[in-house]
A protein has these predicted regions:
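Solvent-exposed coil/turn segments that connect beta secondary-structure elements
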Residues: 5-10, 58-60, 68-72, 87-90, ...
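Extracytoplasmic segments of membrane-associated envelope/inner-membrane machinery
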Residues: 65-138
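Extracytoplasmic/luminal low-complexity segments enriched in Pro/Gly and acidic/polar residues
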Residues: 154-199
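Soluble periplasmic/extracytoplasmic beta-strand elements of cell-envelope proteins
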Residues: 3-5, 18-20, 52-56, 62-68, ...
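Soluble extracytoplasmic domains of inner/organellar membrane proteins
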Residues: 111-171
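Periplasmic/extracytosolic POTRA-like scaffold domains at the N-termini of outer-membrane
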Residues: 8-48, 93-114
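Periplasmic polypeptide-binding modules associated with outer-membrane biogenesis and secretion
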Residues: 2-5, 30-79, 85
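Extracytoplasmic
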Residues: 48, 58-62, 79-80, 86, ...
Length: 199
């Protein structure tokens, strides 16, 4: 029978992992071990927050489950439903909003939101944690435009398809600015102060 040890990385509880994997204390150890690949696929399918799962025999009667989670980036409210936005672009219906990135103006644009989230999921946590909110604001000239409001007071204009790569330049550009302002990463990369006519 299985004494169960679970290694978690962020927000999933031991109970959530047991429920999603159908592995629990008292279950026959070798049955779990032989079905580990199927149980891993099942857990990932049931809960998109599980990115990967490893099941390891640690003794004659014990298992260890290691869970790698999809980072929870923030939340989006679309069509009166609240979604947890995950780093790989998946959306998971949720009842409570967290304090991560607020995704705004994505109503009716689930694919656009998923693409934007997957791009922001590429960012280093130091940059990602500096984002307060992201707003989808397409224009005639820039149909894939997102506007990112940073916690440090700057605003970033970007293309939702490339923002994950271009935001890597943000710390250097922001450090070189004398005043708070706009950093435009839609085409190329340049910045200007708020209220400046010189764009």
């Amino acid at each position: 029978r299985v004494p169960l040890h679970t290694t978690l990385t962020q927000v999933l509880t031991k109970e959530q992992v047991e429920k999603n994997t159908n592995i629990y204390p008292g279950r026959f150890i070798w049955g779990v071990y032989l079905a580990r690949h199927q149980l891993t696929k099942q857990a990932i399918r049931k809960n998109p927050q599980i990115k990967d799962l490893r099941i390891k025999v640690t003794g004659p009667q014990s298992l260890q489950i290691s869970v790698k989670e999809n980072a929870l980036l923030g939340t989006a409210v679309m069509d009166n439903d609240t979604y947890a936005v995950l780093a790989d672009g998946q959306l998971q219906r949720t009842k409570n909003a967290d304090n991560g990135i607020a995704y705004k103006r994505f109503d009716g644009h689930k694919k656009v939101l998923a693409t934007t989230a997957a791009q922001l999921g590429k960012l280093k946590p130091a940059i990602r944690n500096g984002i307060s909110s992201v707003s989808y604001q397409p224009t005639k000239d820039y149909p894939d435009r997102v506007i990112i409001y940073m916690r440090d007071g700057n605003t970033v204009y970007g293309d939702l398809n490339t923002i994950g790569d271009k935001m890597g330049y943000y710390p250097a550009i922001a450090a070189s600015m004398k005043n708070k302002g706009i950093i435009d990463l839609q085409v190329g990369a340049y910045s200007y102060d708020y209220g400046s006519k010189d764009k």
